[in-house]
């Protein structure tokens, strides 16, 4: 992978709806199906901005969703989503707050407004690294995103904030 070789990506992800109800990739969703043949469904994604191939991401799985929004300095509403395995759903609030603070800080400090319509985080227990900063679709090991007030230490909350901010920037 060479960061000086940039491409725009348009991707259609097709999978069995029952096993993989969530189909994600970089960019903005541009089309989707109800049902495809043989119990399959599909979603098409388009990332209109050139990026190196190593920042391409694709996720298919049975994941739960925490959803919120962020209003940019120009008034655009960005859809924020965190996808996790069902048992981890109640531990994502701090990660969502950390993401919103990171977006605001980037705007206030550098005047940089997020340029897609959606920003997603996926956190799964079996991701083999800490995190990956795929544009618009950050992928994390759950240990970097999950923190709950009654079980996590201050250090765990700080780590979530630091990792979410680092991958967003």
Give names to the regions the model predicted.
Residues 1-165:
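Hydrophobic helix-coil surface modules that form long, contiguous segments used
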Residues 169:
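Short active-site segment of divalent metal-dependent hydrolases/proteases
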């Amino acid at each position: 992978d060479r960061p000086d070789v940039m491409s725009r990506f348009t991707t259609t992800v097709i999978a069995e709806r029952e096993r993989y109800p969530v189909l994600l990739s970089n960019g903005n969703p541009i089309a989707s199906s109800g049902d495809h043949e043989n119990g399959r469904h599909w979603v098409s994604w388009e990332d209109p901005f050139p990026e190196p191939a190593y920042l391409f991401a694709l996720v298919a799985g049975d994941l739960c969703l925490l959803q919120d929004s962020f209003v940019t300095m120009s008034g655009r509403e960005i859809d924020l989503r965190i996808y996790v395995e069902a048992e981890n759903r109640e531990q994502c609030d701090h990660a969502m707050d950390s993401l919103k603070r990171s977006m605001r800080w980037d705007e206030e400090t550098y005047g940089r407004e997020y340029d897609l319509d959606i920003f997603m985080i996926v956190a799964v227990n079996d991701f083999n690294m800490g995190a990956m900063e795929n544009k618009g679709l950050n992928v994390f090991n759950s240990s970097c995103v999950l923190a709950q007030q009654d079980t996590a230490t201050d250090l765990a909350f700080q780590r979530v904030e630091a990792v979410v901010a680092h991958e967003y920037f």
